[in-house]
Amino acid sequence: MNFETVIGLEVHVELNTNSKIFSPTSAHFGNEQNTNTNVIDWSFPGVLPVLNKGVVDAGIKAALALNMDIHQHMHFDRKNYFYPDNPKAYQISQFDEPIGYNGWIEVQLEDGTTKKIGIERAHLEEDAGKNTHGTDGFSYVDLNRQGVPLIEIVSEADMRSPEEAYAYLTALKEVIQYTGISDVKMEEGSMRVDANISLRPYGQEEFGTKTELKNLNSFSNVRKGLEYEVQRQAKILRSGGVIRQETRRYDEASKSTILMRVKEGAADYRYFPEPDLPLFEISDEWIEEMRTELPEFPKDRRARYVAELGLSDYDANQLTATKVTSDFFEAAVALGGDAKQVSNWLQGEVAQFLNAEGKTLEEIQLTPENLVEMIAIIEDGTISSKIAKKVFVHLAKNGGGAREYVEKAGLVQISDPEVLIPIIHQVFADNEAAIADFKSGKRNADKAFTGFLMKATKGQANPQVALKLLAQELAKLKED
């Protein structure tokens, strides 16, 4: 029997506001433990939460970007549970009226086709703290993360393969990143994914029993975990077994999913309206104000790059994969840079440098201005493409002007025949054996002189001019 895969994803995104959702404490990641806290985060008696308007702004932007309807009658709810990293013993979240609902996002699959994935809801809530278990036998609680604003985006169970889940996450990350409401860095926990997967016989409308997957710390692991679950569940069902409702985690070492706990039933969080936060309305004017702050999204940029700039679909996809790269490209083209040349540099030397250095485009000194200037001095013959790679590394590490550096470093390409011809004659004098080979008609003997000349000029000879002059001077030798 063959089975249809059914997947839904729950994605928690940390919003990049300066302060937390209900307290004025910094929401910055990476500080020493328990330094980004105050009496609200510790839930001291008598303290009251105050809603950060910037969090609602971000929620509205996310809802609009994901084609969602917006609940304009806003309130928060208490989700009751006890855990050491949750000092209040409840989480302030949204239950029956999330900020966004009934949305969708279009994703591009590997075969080039597109699919629309439904989004059930997006709700605002506070993050919990973090537990760590020490080697000394003690467990520690860090409340820096307590109260950091989250938006949880819950998809419909519309994905029918791990590939579609991967494509959905890629598209979702792009859209959220472009809105500017989060950096969506999984390695820092600002984007976290839980996956629900079940199988059912083809043609059956009722969903099968689902398994929840956790510990998915990369899109690649989401895909691998789901692929493993498809095989595991299919094997059980084909052997006549029954799928239990479980929570499992993906283990990178064994490339398998491992049981965490069996779910006997749905958790009862005893939701009720948050009494310490007032009800409020999201006005039409507020929504429209947030709409005006939305950027051009990746899909639209890709189409424009192909139609107006003449780039290939591949190049357009690569350039828009991150907003930082796309914005850099936009700025360079606006300065007069050739779109194809800028694209080639960003996908080639720049990408290789970033990978080697373990840095992002924002962390190096390259700017649209000095990249465009460097491309211009390649085009006008001031430097060769080979020397340009050296110039680029300098610009990436130190910044500054491309032309200024080239002139100071003595890297200007030699194109003047009056300078090159004497060097060619010296090359001939220094390589008598090669001259003899050439005069005797030895095959490809003339090609050796190109290398000799480039070595003599430390790579600064203009290749086109140098080859033409070499051919001219070698022809004279032959006549002699």
Swiss-Prot record:
Any one Pfam family match given in the protein's UniProt record, by short name = GatB_Yqey
Write the record's keywords in alphabetical order, separated by commas. ATP-binding, Ligase, Nucleotide-binding, Protein biosynthesis
Q: Does the keyword ATP-binding apply?
A: yes
A GO biological process held by the record: translation
Q: Which reaction does it catalyse?
A: L-glutamyl-tRNA(Gln) + L-glutamine + ATP + H2O = L-glutaminyl-tRNA(Gln) + L-glutamate + ADP + phosphate + H(+); L-aspartyl-tRNA(Asn) + L-glutamine + ATP + H2O = L-asparaginyl-tRNA(Asn) + L-glutamate + ADP + phosphate + 2 H(+)
Query: What Gene3D superfamilies does the annotation carry?
Result: 1.10.10.410, GatB domain, N-terminal subdomain
The EC number of this protein is 6.3.5.-
Molecular-function GO term, any one = ATP binding
Q: Which InterPro entries match?
A: Asn/Gln-tRNA_amidoTrfase_suB/E, Asn/Gln-tRNA_Trfase_suB/E_cat, Asn/Gln_amidotransferase, Asn/Gln_tRNA_amidoTrase-B-like, GatB, GatB_C_1, GatB_Yqey_C_2, Gln-tRNA_amidoTrfase_suB_CS
SMART domains associated with the record: GatB_Yqey
| Physiological role | Allows the formation of correctly charged Asn-tRNA(Asn) or Gln-tRNA(Gln) through the transamidation of misacylated Asp-tRNA(Asn) or Glu-tRNA(Gln) in organisms which lack either or both of asparaginyl-tRNA or glutaminyl-tRNA synthetases. The reaction takes place in the presence of glutamine and ATP through an activated phospho-Asp-tRNA(Asn) or phospho-Glu-tRNA(Gln).
What's this protein's family per the entry? Answer: Belongs to the GatB/GatE family. GatB subfamily.
Mind telling me what this protein is named?
Aspartyl/glutamyl-tRNA(Asn/Gln) amidotransferase subunit B
Query: From what organism does this protein derive?
Result: Streptococcus thermophilus (strain ATCC BAA-491 / LMD-9)
